Amino acid sequence: MAEITKADVITFIEKMSVLDLAEMVKELEEKFGVSAAAPVAVAAVAGPAVAEAAEEQTEFDVILKAAGANKIAVIKVVRALTSLGLKEAKDLVDGAPQPVKSGVSKEEAEEAKKQLAESGAEVEVK
């Protein structure tokens, strides 16, 4: 009897239709008592994320969601907060939503949010 190699199995599977392949997967699941469902892996990944959320956040991102009516004032505040050049600050404001500051303390994030909001921008701290 000729021995079947992995390459032979792969070649055989490549020639199967999607319907036949789906039926084969179901039969294999029943025969070996396993599941090919991906949500199990997703649930395992979500676990640590929940634990991290429970810890107190120490670094915040200031996100410019929209420039509002007074775009020039917002550009000036962005330049002051980030020390970007005029063109870079304008591109950041035009490309909203964009992070203005990342990984800053809560106090610094709140101060930046206050300044941007006073200039007419829509801001979010994450």
From Swiss-Prot:
Job description of the protein: Forms part of the ribosomal stalk which helps the ribosome interact with GTP-bound translation factors. Is thus essential for accurate translation.
InterPro entries in the cross-refs: Ribosomal_bL12, Ribosomal_bL12_C, Ribosomal_bL12_C/ClpS-like, Ribosomal_bL12_oligo, Ribosomal_bL12_oligo_N_sf
Family, similarity comment: Belongs to the bacterial ribosomal protein bL12 family.
GO molecular function, one term: mRNA binding
Assembly and oligomerization: Homodimer. Part of the ribosomal stalk of the 50S ribosomal subunit. Forms a multimeric L10(L12)X complex, where L10 forms an elongated spine to which 2 to 4 L12 dimers bind in a sequential fashion. Binds GTP-bound translation factors.
One Gene Ontology term, aspect cellular component: cytosolic large ribosomal subunit
Domain of life: Bacteria
Protein name listed in UniProt: Large ribosomal subunit protein bL12
Lineage of producing organism: Bacteria, Pseudomonadati, Thermodesulfobacteriota, Desulfuromonadia, Geobacterales
UniProt organism field: Geotalea uraniireducens (strain Rf4) (Geobacter uraniireducens)
GO biological-process terms attached to the record: translation
Pfam families recorded: Ribosomal_L12, Ribosomal_L12_N
Stored PANTHER family: 39S RIBOSOMAL PROTEIN L12, LARGE RIBOSOMAL SUBUNIT PROTEIN BL12M
Record keywords, A-Z: Ribonucleoprotein, Ribosomal protein
Composition-biased stretches (Basic and acidic residues): 104-116
Region (Disordered): 97-126
